[in-house]
A protein has these predicted regions:
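Linker/hinge segments immediately adjacent to helix-turn-helix/homeobox DNA-binding domains
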Residues: 1-23, 39, 78-80
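Short, basic, alpha-helical segments at the C-terminal edge of helix-turn-helix-like DNA-binding modules
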Residues: 68-79
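Short helix-to-turn junction characteristic of helix-turn-helix DNA-binding domains
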Residues: 32-36, 75
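The N-cap/first-turn positions of alpha helices
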Residues: 24-28
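Pre-signature/interface helix of ABC/ABC-like ATPase nucleotide-binding domains
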Residues: 13-19, 30, 57, 61, ...
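N-terminal start-of-chain detector that recognizes signal peptides
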Residues: 1-2, 32, 44
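Recognition helix of helix-turn-helix DNA-binding domains
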Residues: 35-70
Length: 80
């Protein structure tokens, strides 16, 4: 297990397993957690920005965070 490197996305499957996210939620969480804005994460995944924001809201609910900065901090605390 290595530490989370700033700007480096976490494997979405790891987030799925550790946080109970779906794989799609893990993908969004990984990209936003690495510092991308939702619109940039959406573009990277080839989905609409509103879809990314909707998925991100579900990620927030499942992880107990309410802001992107809190998600970044949560992923850092998991110390992958």
């Amino acid at each position: 297990v290595s530490s989370l490197e700033p700007g480096r996305p976490v494997d979405p499957a790891v987030l799925r397993d550790l946080l109970g996210l779906t794989l799609n939620e893990g993908r969004i969480a990984s990209l936003v957690g690495s510092g991308l804005q939702p619109r940039d994460a959406a573009a990277a995944l080839g989905i609409a920005e509103e879809t990314a924001r909707s998925v991100l809201k579900r990620v927030f609910a499942k992880t107990g965070v309410s802001r992107q900065a809190e998600l970044v901090a949560l992923l850092a605390r998991l110390a992958f």
